[in-house]
Amino acid sequence: MLRSLYSGISGMKNFQTKLDVIGNNIANVNTVGFKKSRVTFKDMVSQTIAGGSAAGATIGGTNSKQIGLGSSSGTIDTIHSTSATQSTGRTLDLAIDGDGYFRIDTGDGTAYTRAGNFYLDNTGTLVTGDGYHVLNMNGGTIKIPTDAQSFSIGSDGKVSIVDAEGKTQDGGQIGIVTFANSDGLDKIGSNLYRESLNSGTASAANQPGDGGTGALKSGFLEMSNVDLTDEFTEMIVAQRGFQSNSKIITTSDEILQELVNLKR
């Protein structure tokens, strides 16, 4: 009887975790470059009531008798599928059409992002919305002269600047990196990732479109890959799973109460 109670508790905890993940996905449905997460479950150890036996001369073999002891969270995965892009017409909005990540200098290390909503600070340096520097192919910053007439960013990441005298200048090139296992990247907030032991180190910066990286699309933003239809469906499943496991606990409690009443 206690086994069913603990199985129900483990199930409720797991579905609560699933609801937490779904809630975060839905909250970020409009977050630029956001990648949704999912939860997988695995069964816990099973108690063997009777072991199996091999077939004999006069009788066949038997299977083991086992009772499971509940479930636990297996993995919480980040799904790095490419999502739809939205046209903005803004030069500093960049989408990666394929694999790869922008390199960002956070001041205390290098981070990576798919969110390409970039800006220029008062010095003309290309930065994220939080003021972190966007790095070029060589690991340096990208600067646009404050008196430049205009600038553009090509699909290969090259920045072309028309200076105050109307001459075209080379403004550097945005580099894109890849990972052996992008699923292993750690989310650190602000649409940023950090490499982990399981993601492997970032590749050398490649020109967008080379080395397995996607080309850049200026004037576009990659949107979240969250699908509300899928999330609401999973939310219903998680809600029913939570309710069903809570029913296991209440039913087991009622049976235990009946056993206690037998003494009266």
UniProtKB/Swiss-Prot annotation:
Sequence similarity: Belongs to the flagella basal body rod proteins family.
Record keyword Cell inner membrane present: no
GO biological processes: bacterial-type flagellum assembly; bacterial-type flagellum-dependent swarming motility
The organism's taxonomic lineage, starting at the top: Bacteria, Bacillati, Bacillota, Bacilli, Bacillales
Primary residence: other
GO cellular component, one term: bacterial-type flagellum hook
Name used for this protein in its record: Flagellar basal-body rod protein FlgG
Protein origin, superkingdom: Bacteria
A Pfam family per the record: LlgE_F_G_D1
Keyword Nucleus belongs to the record: no
